[in-house]
Each structure stands twice: as C-alpha cells, then as structure tokens.
Amino acid sequence: MSIEDIIKNEDILDCWKEIQKSNSDKNISKGIFEYDIEEYHTFLLDEIVEASEYMNMSTDTLINEMLLFTKDNKSLVINFSNERLNKKIPFSSPLSYEELSNGYTEEELDIAYQDLENETDAIIDIGTLLTYLIDLIFLFKEEKSYKKYLTEKLCYSEIHAKEFIEYEKNIIENL
C-alpha cells in the first residue's frame, strides 16, 4: 500500500472534507496537499513506517488499521481532529526547542525558537489528519508504546509525553 491508497480512500476524504468545512478560519489547505507532492508523500510514509515500528506491526497493517478505524469511527475521527485543531495542549511547562522541532536543531531548521513556538500559520492539510489517525491508533490499540514513541521519535520529555496522552484521552472522553 502507498500514501495514494490512503489519501484516495473515500472514508478518509469524507473526514477531510468535514474537517475543512469546520476549520475554514484556519490556514487550511483548499486541496489535499500544499507541499511538493513527492517529497510530502515520502515524509508521510516515513511517519507511518516509524509509527508502525513502535507498534510492532507492518506498515501495511498500520495503514489497514488506519483505514478500518476511519471507516468504523468517522465521527470520532472528525470530532477528535477538530478538537485537536482548536484546543491548545495544556503543558505544565514550555516545550524545549527539541520538543517543538521533533529533534531538529535550530541550525538544521534555520528557525528561531520564538518563530517556531509562534507558528500559527502552519498549513493544515490531509497529512494533519493522517498524523491524528496515527495518534488514535496508538491510543486505542498500542497505548503502552505511545509514550515511548513520543519520547523517542518526537523528542518529548517524559512529563510532556504523559501530559500529551492525557490531553488526547480527555478529548476522546469529552466527545
């Protein structure tokens, strides 16, 4: 399976259209992608491959899980995504540059901490939905691996990883 299989899936596209409608006030992509397609597909596939490794499942299995989860839980996927886009994560302390940049240095990104922290114009596209789906699969199927993924892959501190998981669980409980 490929990224194209995911983004052309009717259930995924239905969710994406609803998220677009609900967030018209944000910098949301009018199409599916705003970036160089080939490069972005590679990035998204890498995200899925890495997440699947933390879940101890094949990439194809994770993709199938994402598609089935979306098919069976469309309203949850839409509502969870809308909440994530509209609620600030209540961390107990500011994130470090490493946490904000998922492990990249300021030199590698050539973006100052303040600019990275204040990034409110990030373009929201279908890739955002796919990352939220990965989060949901972790929460519902592989919660024990989620904290490890957040600390190792996304470079969150132990405290921030725990707070992030609680934040997402609270969203689900309140839907």
Residue ranges and their predicted role:
Residues I3-T42, K87-Y97:
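Short Lys/Arg-rich basic patches
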Residues N9-L13, S58, G103-T105, E142-S145, ...:
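Intrinsically disordered, low-complexity coil/linker segments enriched for acidic/polar
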Residues Y40-E47, E108-Y113, E142-T151, A161-I171:
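Amphipathic alpha-helical segments in structured regions that serve as interaction surfaces
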Residues M57-L67, D125-I134:
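Short amphipathic alpha-helical segments
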Residues S58, M66-S81, E168-I172:
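Repeat-associated, polar segments at repeat-unit boundaries in modular proteins
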Residues N73-S93, S157:
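Short, positively charged interaction helices/loops
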